[in-house]
Amino acid sequence: MTRLISADKSEDDLLEASLRPRALSDYVGQEKAKGNLGLFIDAARGRSEALDHVLLYGPPGLGKTTLANIIACEMGVNIKSTSGPVIERPGDLAAILTNLEAHDVLFIDEIHRLSHVVEEILYPAMEDFQLDIIIGQGPSARTIKLDLPKFTLVGATTRAGLLSSPLRDRFGVISRLEFYTHEELAFIITRSARIFGMAIAPEGAMELARRSRGTPRIANRLLRRVRDFAQVRADGVITREVADQALALLEIDDMGFDMMDRAILLTIIDKFGGGPVGLDTIAAAISEESDTIEDVYEPFLIQNGFLNRTPRGRVATAAAYRHFGRIAPEPPQGKLF
């Protein structure tokens, strides 16, 4: 079952192609990353050069794919999109690279999942725009260098720490994407509603924004579900009251937590005394993959002060206790003697 407020991609998000801005000037939020990219793009265009390689990292659903497409549009070049798990063999990458034209953008999503063997092929391609091809086997094998057109690699990852140092060091532009503010999300929601022909009140847009976990992908997904509710059970206009009723039906609370978020926090509080408790233990207790908890759920809980990550494990904060109407335990007092 697809988690409604998961920031992972789903079939429903194919509709987002029509919502994505095509220019940096239309892109909402991420002002620091947007400003830097705009400067570097203008400089590259002024010199008629390919843009330096770009690494975009941050939690899922914040606009990394959108920015990659905007880079290609702003540079006036084509974009070839793929993902790390799809490129299984060096030959797969070689086929992609040899089909690029001058200054094209190659977008690799989940670039941290590239195999070490594939990375070795990517190093000279990024640095020297050359492809090393081995012909033959054994002692008679020889390597020839194939020149590649100068291109821009845009890599996206939710786990920048898993990138090897040699790969990370070859990116000239590294930008971290942050969670969006409520005001930015309300603007995005209003724009999406206009594109879809929906009627939405400013208060309704802000209510959706507050519960979208700082993530545009979640905001657009919630907007489509609330639209269904407004169409069937209201007059078609998404007001604050309609949004509140629809989200209550979907079991999404005031903080944007769904059943999985509540399960994580309540497991730590009720079963493990508030923590610390290991990630694998939490995953086993709620029947979820530990990587999914770490990549998808934890960033929002940590940044909003509901969860602490310590060397001994995860700890529920006083804010988490208050959210569920519980009294946080007193911190242990150290003894002087």
Swiss-Prot record:
CDD domains: AAA. Keywords: ATP-binding, Cytoplasm, DNA damage, DNA recombination, DNA repair, DNA-binding, Hydrolase, Nucleotide-binding. Its EC number is 3.6.4.-. This is Holliday junction branch migration complex subunit RuvB. Has 3 domains, the large (RuvB-L) and small ATPase (RuvB-S) domains and the C-terminal head (RuvB-H) domain. The head domain binds DNA, while the ATPase domains jointly bind ATP, ADP or are empty depending on the state of the subunit in the translocation cycle. During a single DNA translocation step the structure of each domain remains the same, but their relative positions change. Its main location: cytoplasm. PANTHER family: HOLLIDAY JUNCTION BRANCH MIGRATION COMPLEX SUBUNIT RUVB, PTHR42848. It comes from Citrifermentans bemidjiense (strain ATCC BAA-1014 / DSM 16622 / JCM 12645 / Bem) (Geobacter bemidjiensis). InterPro entries: AAA+_ATPase, AAA_lid_4, DNA_helicase_Holl-junc_RuvB, P-loop_NTPase, RuvB-like_N, RuvB_C, WH-like_DNA-bd_sf, WH_DNA-bd_sf. It is an enzyme of class 3 (hydrolase). DNA binds at residues 309, 314. One of its GO terms (cellular component) is Holliday junction resolvase complex. Belongs to the RuvB family. Residues 1-180 are annotated as: Large ATPase domain (RuvB-L). One of its GO terms (molecular function) is ATP binding. It catalyses: ATP + H2O = ADP + phosphate + H(+). SMART domains: AAA (SM00382). Mg(2+) binds at residue 65. Residues 254-337 are annotated as: Head domain (RuvB-H). Homohexamer. Forms an RuvA(8)-RuvB(12)-Holliday junction (HJ) complex. HJ DNA is sandwiched between 2 RuvA tetramers; dsDNA enters through RuvA and exits via RuvB. An RuvB hexamer assembles on each DNA strand where it exits the tetramer. Each RuvB hexamer is contacted by two RuvA subunits (via domain III) on 2 adjacent RuvB subunits; this complex drives branch migration. In the full resolvosome a probable DNA-RuvA(4)-RuvB(12)-RuvC(2) complex forms which resolves the HJ. Gene3D superfamilies: 1.10.8.60, P-loop containing nucleotide triphosphate hydrolases, Winged helix-like DNA-binding domain superfamily/Winged helix DNA-binding domain. Residues 181-251 are annotated as: Small ATPAse domain (RuvB-S).
